[in-house]
């Protein structure tokens, strides 16, 4: 790993950790109703919507409210896509989005996945981008945060039947946290060169003729392949280029802050209109981890022991550093097949990367975005080396708990913390407890569901795709890498990440439906058990710390938590990883 990469990683961690306490304290004050201006701002909204802020909910009612909120979001996004040809702010006169793609996109943005099988600047009108996709970026982020706040209250309260009001929590986190930070962030991005306008697209003449290979398409619009499975292409030339316009900065801000990741442009944060400078790139990386890291302090603040939050944050940080080092290390190594063709190995694996970012910024961005269930990219993960590309896969397959998405990462890590203290209790023959609450059969059943639902969706979905002709038809690269593309797609969808090995042609009815199902159950198949755990914990009595109680704020617990995440979270995927990136790595270096 280069000196630049080490310095970049060090500066990133220092700046991130400096923000944890102030932002975490602010979020705790907002969500616990201690923000002074909240009442004046919120009261008109509550009256307009008929919400009684003093009426709290049990876990089942809270879960139903969250599900209803998100179902309505799916329906709204689907309708806007299907009607966009008849709606204003469509200067390119884009037609309605196809039913299967609209279904996939609606679920994708409602679940904070932001998987995009379509080309954003060639599919979505400005109204759809703003009113459907950007709005859901706020709402899906708010959903994740309020769920983890509910779980934290479950630990903090005792002998209680309720832990908050879902509508109040959603309002507070959106109005007082997500919205103000996004406004400031969008202004900063505009200053860096991110575009923000409603102009029609611009056709310009390039300085020289551009030659490229254009894939031949069949009657269904899918690439034709030869008998070896390779895409058939034909040479083409052009001297014109269409420059996409649009309100990018306002969407870019919440896309990163809310760990959403869906780009206005198809190239996402590799596009200069979304991420033009190294400074904007650094701030985008920082903003992805900003709220997930701060929520760890919020957790400690609300339960009354900030050491608990720092312990969870320490476990996350240690795993993050190891994974970031691995990604940057393997991307710094040149592809041996390209080296044989005369490419200078000193530059590392620059395929699919922007020269303004290079190896360090691209490798670190890839690690951050896949750990945090963001999915935004500033480089093409499909072009990473086999082991460099293995890191984003592992990041997601850990369950998106190393920082993770806003809210989702922390509640996922707390689920693993419950599992860790349960394992420790079994080893010493004592009833496990965490933060003064006994961990009993009901909690462990819900923990098991929350941990196992995602691997089930990933592995079953991948198996179905490689067995059926419709699934194999989307593979652009046969062999181990083609399998990795499918595995990555279902891993990304079920873990609500949204990034992709872009070689897979996923905008087909088969993948739109299959990935849509994986996204929905990968999100709410975890949220409902987590809320059930919160309700059960809130109803329990708090027990005093005894001589046999495992301290959950020291190095021993941090080590146990990391081990639990690695063993329980990752082992499910080892056979699948062996069939994909591991085989590809061995084949690549065997050829060398």
Curated annotation (Swiss-Prot):
InterPro entries: KdpA
Coiled coil regions, renumbered to chain: none
One cellular-component annotation, GO: plasma membrane
One Pfam family from the record: KdpA
GO molecular function: P-type potassium transmembrane transporter activity; potassium ion binding
Main location class: membrane
Cellular compartments annotated: Cell inner membrane
Protein origin, superkingdom: Bacteria
UniProt KW keywords: Cell inner membrane, Cell membrane, Ion transport, Membrane, Potassium, Potassium transport, Transmembrane, Transmembrane helix, Transport
Keyword Transmembrane helix listed: yes
Family from the record: Belongs to the KdpA family.
PANTHER family for this protein: POTASSIUM-TRANSPORTING ATPASE A CHAIN (PTHR30607), POTASSIUM-TRANSPORTING ATPASE POTASSIUM-BINDING SUBUNIT (PTHR30607:SF2)
Record function comment: Part of the high-affinity ATP-driven potassium transport (or Kdp) system, which catalyzes the hydrolysis of ATP coupled with the electrogenic transport of potassium into the cytoplasm. This subunit binds the periplasmic potassium ions and delivers the ions to the membrane domain of KdpB through an intramembrane tunnel.
Protein name (Swiss-Prot/TrEMBL): Potassium-transporting ATPase potassium-binding subunit
Organism: Dechloromonas aromatica (strain RCB)
Organism phylogeny: Bacteria, Pseudomonadati, Pseudomonadota, Betaproteobacteria, Rhodocyclales
């Amino acid at each position: 790993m280069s000196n630049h990469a080490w310095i970049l990683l060090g500066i990133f961690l220092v700046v991130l950790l400096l923000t944890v306490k102030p932002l975490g304290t602010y979020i705790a004050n907002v969500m616990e109703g201690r923000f002074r201006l909240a009442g004046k701002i919120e009261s008109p909204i509550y009256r307009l919507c008929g919400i009684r802020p003093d009426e709290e909910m049990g876990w089942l009612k809270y879960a139903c409210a969250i599900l209803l909120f998100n179902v309505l979001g799916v329906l709204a996004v689907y309708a806007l896509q299907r009607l966009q040809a008849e709606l204003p702010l469509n200067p390119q006169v884009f037609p309605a989005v196809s039913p299967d793609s609209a279904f996939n996109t609606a679920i994708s943005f409602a679940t904070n996945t932001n998987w995009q099988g379509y080309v954003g600047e060639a599919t979505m009108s400005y109204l759809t981008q703003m009113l459907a996709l950007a709005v859901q970026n706020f709402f899906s982020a708010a959903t994740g945060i309020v769920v983890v706040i509910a779980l934290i209250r479950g630990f903090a309260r005792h002998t209680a039947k309720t832990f908050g009001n879902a509508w109040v929590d959603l309002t507070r986190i959106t109005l007082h946290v997500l919205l103000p930070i996004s406004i400031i962030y969008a202004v900063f991005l505009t200053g860096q060169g991110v575009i923000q306008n409603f102009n029609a697209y611009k056709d310009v003449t390039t300085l020289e003729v551009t030659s490229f290979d254009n894939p031949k398409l069949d009657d269904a619009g899918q690439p034709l392949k030869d008998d070896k499975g390779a895409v058939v292409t034909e040479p083409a030339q052009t001297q014109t280029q269409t420059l996409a316009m649009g309100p990018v900065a306002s969407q870019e801000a919440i896309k990163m802050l809310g760990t959403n990741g869906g780009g206005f442009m198809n190239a996402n944060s590799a596009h200069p209109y979304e991420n033009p400078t190294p400074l904007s790139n650094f701030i985008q990386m920082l903003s992805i981890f900003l709220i997930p890291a701060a929520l760890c302090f919020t957790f400690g603040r609300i339960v009354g022991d900030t050491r608990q939050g720092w312990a969870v944050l320490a476990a996350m940080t240690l795993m993050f550093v190891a994974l970031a080092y691995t990604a940057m290390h393997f991307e710094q190594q040149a592809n041996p097949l390209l080296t044989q063709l005369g490419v200078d190995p000193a530059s590392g694996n620059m395929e699919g990367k922007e020269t303004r970012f290079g190896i360090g910024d691209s490798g670190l961005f890839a690690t951050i975005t896949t750990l945090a269930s963001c999915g935004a990219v500033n480089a093409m993960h499909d072009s990473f080396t086999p082991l460099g590309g293995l890191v984003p896969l592992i990041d997601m397959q850990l369950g998106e708990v190393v920082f993770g998405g806003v809210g989702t990462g922390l509640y996922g890590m707390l689920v693993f913390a419950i599992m860790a203290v349960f394992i420790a209790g079994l080893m010493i023959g004592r009833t496990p407890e965490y933060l003064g609450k006994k961990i009993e059969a009901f909690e462990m059943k819900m923990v098991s569901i929350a941990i196992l639902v995602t691997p089930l969706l990933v592995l079953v979905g991948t198996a179905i795709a490689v067995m059926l002709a419709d699934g194999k038809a989307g593979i652009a690269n046969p062999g181990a890498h083609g399998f990795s593309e499918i595995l990555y797609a279902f891993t990304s969808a079920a873990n609500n990440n949204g990034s992709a090995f872009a070689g897979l042609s996923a905008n087909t009815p088969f993948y739109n439906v299959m990935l849509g199902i994986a996204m929905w159950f990968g999100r709410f198949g975890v949220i409902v058990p987590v809320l059930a755990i919160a309700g059960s914990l809130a109803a329990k009595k708090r027990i005093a710390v005894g001589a046999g109680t495992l301290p959950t704020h020291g190095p021993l617990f941090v080590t146990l938590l990391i081990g639990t995440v690695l063993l329980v979270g990752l082992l499910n995927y080892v056979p699948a990883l062996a069939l994909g990136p591991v085989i590809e790595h061995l084949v690549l270096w065997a050829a060398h």
